[in-house]
Amino acid sequence: RAFERSDPSRPTIAHSGVPPHLPQLDGTDSHLWFGWRQGAAGDLAVRARRLPRMVRFVSEFGADSVPNSADFVGVSRWPHIDVERLATDHRYDREIVEVMFPPDAFETFEAWRATTQRYQSHVLKVQIETLRRLKYRPTGGFCFSILADPHPAISASVLDHERVPKDAYETVRDACAPVIVVAGLPPDWVSPGDRLRLDVHLVNDRRTPLDDARVHATATWAGDRQTWTFGGPVDADDVVQVGTIDLTVPDTLGEVLIELAAIDVKARVERKQRLPGWLRNSRAG
């Protein structure tokens, strides 16, 4: 109220993370921890479809991971770690970490750390790309949970307390590039004969248009591949659906990998990306 009285021209909120509710149907900015505190990483897109106002500005999202500067963890008796000390002093979220990535399921500390970092990268990549695809429709911006730790911690940061990058640091930088190509998130498992339709979008945050943008998509599986090419202009500061990957899952064991490459022919700018995760044929096991 003091802020409102001082400057009524500026909107004010009591605090962030308030979902829409009666009588304040707009809510405030959102804290959406899909893939960590609830659900899966792709559930952010589901929430956006069902309640668009929840993603107008998302100010917290991500997943915790073990940092590279990790002497404080104490792993001389791996996999036995002092979880009480880590929870009290170093933000170790035992209830979640030990369900998703129980230390005793990993032979080494290094394998445990790498797995948590790869998962964090997956969550941030999927959700940043989702929010950018929804640019202005309705997303006006986002801020993932933590950039850098102020002290030794197992947290959602992408830089640890020594400013050593985690795996997610490069992932975030790539996902926040001025021009990206984004495809719909595929299911984790598929069966032979299933039909996949994944919409492909080009996001252009530059102040200049992409006059002749091309997207090349390639699906690869054991012994074969299928390709698609889409193209067209993309205005400055805009998002355009350039095409749809329409794939019938092959009758083969193993993984199906989908890769995308976006090229601005005139500017000779190229962006490549691999779809998050693998499509695993359910017959593989």
Residue ranges and their predicted role:
Residues 1-23:
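Active-site neighborhood of glycoside hydrolase catalytic domains
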Residues 3-4, 13, 40-212, 216-220, ...:
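Substrate-binding clefts and catalytic carboxylate motifs of secreted carbohydrate-active enzymes
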Residues 9, 139, 253-255:
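A general structural motif
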Residues 14, 230, 273-275:
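A generic structural motif
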Residues 19-49:
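C-terminal cap/loop subdomain of S1 sulfatases and analogous C-terminal strand-loop tails that border
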Residues 204, 221, 262-266:
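Surface-exposed loop/turn motifs at beta-strand-loop junctions within extracellular Ig-like
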Residues 213, 224-253:
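Intrinsically disordered, low-complexity Pro/Gly/Ser/Thr-rich segments with frequent PxxP/GP/PP motifs
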Residues 241-243, 248-285:
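Terminal connector regions
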